[in-house]
Amino acid sequence: MKFDESSLYNIKSDLDGIRCPLFDLAAWKNGLAFKKIDFSETGRPVIKIAELNNGISSNTSFTQGDYGEDVYIRRDDLLFSWSGNPQTSIDVFRYRLQDGWLNQHIFKVTANEEFVTKDFLYYVLKYLKPHFTQIAANKQTTGLGHVTIADLKRMSLVVPSKEVQEQIVLVLKAIDDKIEVNKNINDNLAA
């Protein structure tokens, strides 16, 4: 999907609501740049893009350090991987693994509930994935592309009332729940 410069950042909408920068809808906390010295055989996992895509594996690094609440991640936190190959690494996730520490190149996204619900923000970010992918591709150097805080501040969209947000979430969550059930059935059949 290709966007011109205007529609890439000024998200079109038929919804009634207030137009505001995407950045204002959440707190965006980048993970830490862990070093080999931080790693140990046990402890909490360091969550990189590979873990978001493939789960905890023998390649996952662990640490026994304590790095603060702002980079500690729990089940159902919203995460946005903003750096890497635009086609494979730029994405939005509901965190589903064990508690861990957030690595660099991933934002922990905490909804600003004054404007949006957490679930609505998740679906908005998923909807914007093609925009994020093109933004990252437009900046791609040596295989890596980025979506920066400046991009999040530049992007604007219409935010509907909380009632409309809840109606949208009801429809999309029902579909997501069905997909999850089918995925679990497929996983059990494959096992």
Language model segments and positions:
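Residues that recognize and position ribonucleotide moieties
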Residues: 15-18, 45, 99-100, 145
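Sequence-specific dsDNA recognition surfaces
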Residues: 18-36, 45-78
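Short coil/turn segments at secondary-structure boundaries
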Residues: 35-42, 136-138
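A short beta-sheet element
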Residues: 48-49, 67-129
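"Short basic amphipathic alpha-helical interaction patches in structured regions
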Residues: 62, 93-96, 123-124, 138, ...
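A short glycine-rich beta-alpha junction/loop motif
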Residues: 100-107, 139-169
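Short, positively charged
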Residues: 117-151
